[in-house]
Regions:
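N-terminal strand-loop-strand
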Residues: 1-21
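Short hydrophobic alpha-helix segments
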Residues: 8, 56-59
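Residue-level detector of conserved, well-ordered beta-strand and adjacent loop positions
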Residues: 8, 24, 74
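Short glycine-enriched, charge-decorated loop/helix-capping segments at active-site entrances
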Residues: 21-27
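Unchanged
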Residues: 27-51, 59-113
Length: 117
C-alpha cells in the first residue's frame, strides 16, 4: 500500500536509542537466513505473519557502545494477517515515504529511510 511500518522504542539502556523510531526486525539466530530471521521476529514480537520480499539496503552503523549491521527488506502481510500486536515498542505507525522524514529515527535506521526516499 506504499506505507512502511515504523516502531518507536521505549526507554532503552542507551539514551541515544531511547524513544527513537526504527523499522521492526531483530537478530539472526544460528542456521537462519536474514529473511527467515525477519519473518520469525515479526511473528514472535508482533504476531504479524509476513512474506519477506526484495532487499532494500544494508546499513552498518557504529553507536558509542555497540555496532550494528542491518539489512532491510520490503515485506507484505500474509493473507491471514489481521494486524499486529505491539509488545516491545512504545508506539507504532504506518508512514508514507514523505511522513518518514518527520520521525526521530535511531541513527542506524536513517540509512534505510534514505534508501526509501
Amino acid at each position: 500500500n506504499g506505507k512502511y511500518l515504523c516502531m518507536q522504542k521505549g526507554k532503552t539502556k542507551f539514551e541515544y536509542t531511547s524513544y527513537k523510531w526504527e523499522f521492526p526486525g531483530g537478530k539472526i539466530e544460528p542456521g537462519e537466513t536474514p529473511q527467515q530471521a525477519l519473518a520469525r521476529e515479526l511473528l514472535e514480537e508482533m504476531e504479524y505473519p509476513v512474506e519477506v520480499g526484495e532487499k532494500l539496503v544494508t546499513v552498518n552503523h557504529e553507536y558509542p557502545d555497540f555496532s550494528i549491521t542491518m539489512t532491510a527488506y520490503l515485506c507484505t502481510p500474509k493473507a491471514e494477517a489481521d494486524g499486529f500486536r505491539r509488545r516491545e515498542h512504545a508506539d507504532s505507525k504506518w508512514c508514507s515515504p514523505v511522513e518518514l522524514k518527520n520521525l526521530d529515527w535511531a541513527a542506524a535506521d536513517v540509512g534505510v529511510v534514505e534508501s526509501i526516499l
